[in-house]
Amino acid sequence: MQNRVSVNAHSQPIVKYLITYADKLRLQIDRLPNGCTVIDAGIKVPGSLEAGRLIGEICMGGLGRITLTHTDTFTKWPLTVNVHTSNPVIACLGSQYAGWSLSHGEGKDGFYALGSGPARAMATKIKDGNEEPVEELYKELNYRDKHTETAIVMEVDKVPPVEVTDKIARACKLDPSHLTVILTPTSSLAGGMQVVARVLEVALHKAHALHFPLENIIDGTGCAPVPPPHPNFIKAMGRTNDAILFGGRVHLFVKGSDEAAETLANELPSSVSRDYGKPFAEVFKEYKYDFFKVDAMLFSPASVIVTTVDSGRSFHAGEVDVELLERSFGG
């Protein structure tokens, strides 16, 4: 990718905003012994939809705009999150995608999370004497960021041990005092909001899995209904996934041939997956809660439009499913 826009430079002002206005956003700010800043967006405090919206923009490296509106697509669930970015590959895959596996300890006392956000673009490791990105994806993106501060988002319900934050800071070549960790439990308002704000990201991730040339994706928008939270983790996770699988809509603007765009449109919707047809919590239970047994092609929006800017043609595929969304969201 030739675009060297900095996901950390663009997201830091939003991080600072969360800290400055933590009171009105119902957040809690703490400092770990190593100096790392921790923003609790729903563990010991209520958090808020607005906090989730802003955290979603941080996840996108400050390169996306996320808004909340009401639409009439789903009569019972009018609250809708809208996402747009003019840098879809870097914003969604180079920052928002939760691709950094972080862990410490073992068993029920251990800590495990997938890191999302701009810190991913800075993180490196030494392999065979050479420095390389922590995630292989960045080699494909040909993207690496550098900045004086960074932030990472974790969808967890407990504070990570200081050892995990030390690891993140080391990988980013920063002192821990220049790292901010943002915590968004799945069952919280902010957590649900920032997950559904990934409606465009899941489309980019699936396009990558389908081997569509990422450099040909030049702009993108998406929207999905905001689900009601649920105190049970599995049900909360199910609802956030279903908001995208059954209610997500994405519009990609691409370069290249009409044939490639039409193929992408036809293969993108969640309905092409073998596991489509029931709420995600039910699918997950059938696989005995083994996430890796779920068909990876399921994680995608319900309906898509792919517009080829070279010809002006648009290709439509998939559709939203009100009945399945109702089964997932409840009364």
Curated annotation (Swiss-Prot):
From the UniProt record, give one GO term of the biological process aspect: formaldehyde catabolic process
- Report the EC number(s), separated by commas if there are several: 3.5.4.27
Q: Which UniProt keywords apply?
A: Cytoplasm, Hydrolase, One-carbon metabolism
Q: Pfam families in the record, alphabetically?
A: MCH
**Superkingdom, according to UniProt?**
Bacteria
The protein's location, in the record's own words, is: Cytoplasm
Task: Give TM regions.
Answer: none
* Known catalytic reactions: 5,10-methenyl-5,6,7,8-tetrahydromethanopterin + H2O = N(5)-formyl-5,6,7,8-tetrahydromethanopterin + H(+)
Q: Which GO terms of the cellular component aspect does the record hold?
A: cytoplasm
Q: Hydrolase as a keyword?
A: yes
Listed pathway(s): One-carbon metabolism; formaldehyde degradation; formate from formaldehyde (H(4)MPT route): step 3/5
MF annotations from Gene Ontology: methenyltetrahydromethanopterin cyclohydrolase activity
- Family according to the record: Belongs to the MCH family.
User: Sorted alphabetically, which HAMAP family does this protein's record hold?
Assistant: McH
Role: Catalyzes the hydrolysis of methenyl-H(4)MPT(+) to 5-formyl-H(4)MPT.
Q: What is this protein called?
A: Methenyltetrahydromethanopterin cyclohydrolase
> What is the source species?
Methylococcus capsulatus (strain ATCC 33009 / NCIMB 11132 / Bath)
